[in-house]
Regions:
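Gram-negative (and chloroplast) outer-membrane scaffold detector with strong preference
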Residues: 38, 72-143, 150-156, 201
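A broad helix-preferring feature
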Residues: 12-16, 141, 157-159
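Short glycine/proline- and aromatic-enriched beta-strand/turn motifs that initiate or cap beta-hairpins
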Residues: 19-78, 133, 194-203
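Conserved long hydrophobic alpha-helices within structured protein cores
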Residues: 28-39, 100-106, 161-163
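Predominantly the C-terminal beta-signal and adjacent terminal strand-loop region
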Residues: 39-48, 57-62, 91, 144, ...
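Cleavable N-terminal export/targeting peptides
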Residues: 1-27
Length: 203
């Protein structure tokens, strides 16, 4: 009986993918992702008190183009051979506004039965984060995209992806060369739309 219990304990401690049990794919994933961000649209709505004392309420939108970069690390869990859910955290830049520390959850759907073969995939990513500035504020972000996965080995995958994203952030307000103090700001919302091209290495 003791020998049987010991064998069962060892089997529970060894991941199923290692012992060649019910699943042929690794259950846990880790990796890094790098990308280019091309922001093509931005809108804003500010409400603040000017240095002269009166209240300002500017708002507007514009189609311009700005280039930025981003980098993430991620850890996830393979729900099946076709679905993965992962937590992403990293560093990203938003136009000339500021850098951000995003944290998001991504659900990925892979197409194809065999994880050892190259496959296409689609994903949706939703999250929040903090702006990196004197007075940090929360940001909200969402993206949807897809890509192509190259299977380098059972555990190592190389991904190439494209996506569209929307971001709500809160930049500092510059009023004719004067930065408005945080306590004088009632609203500093900015909305950004962008596309991104990236690559990732997953283990």
């Amino acid at each position: 009986m003791k020998r049987i219990l010991l064998i069962l304990l060892v089997m529970l401690l060894i991941p199923a993918g290692v012992r060649g049990g019910t699943v042929s794919y690794p259950k846990y994933t880790f990796g890094a992702e790098w990308g280019y961000i091309g922001t093509f649209y931005s809108g804003y709505h500010y409400n603040f008190y000017a240095p002269e004392g009166y209240r300002m309420d500017p708002r507007g939108h514009e189609f311009t183009y700005d280039s930025n970069a981003e980098a993430y690390i991620h850890a996830g869990y393979n729900l099946s051979e076709k679905y993965n859910i992962s937590l992403y955290m990293g560093l990203s830049a938003l136009r000339e506004y500021h850098h951000t520390l995003p944290l998001s959850i991504r659900l990925t759907r892979f197409y194809g039965e065999d994880h050892m073969k190259d496959r296409i995939f689609a994903f949706i990513d939703l999250g929040s984060g903090l702006s990196v500035k004197k007075n940090p504020q929360e940001i909200l972000t969402g993206k949807i995209g897809g890509g192509y996965r190259i299977s380098l080995s059972r555990n190592t995958k190389l991904d190439f992806m494209v996506s569209l994203r929307s971001v709500l952030t809160h930049p500092d307000i510059d009023y004719y060369g004067t930065e408005i103090p945080h306590e004088k700001i009632n609203r500093n919302n900015a909305y950004l739309s962008a596309f991104s091209i990236g690559m990732a290495l997953t283990f």
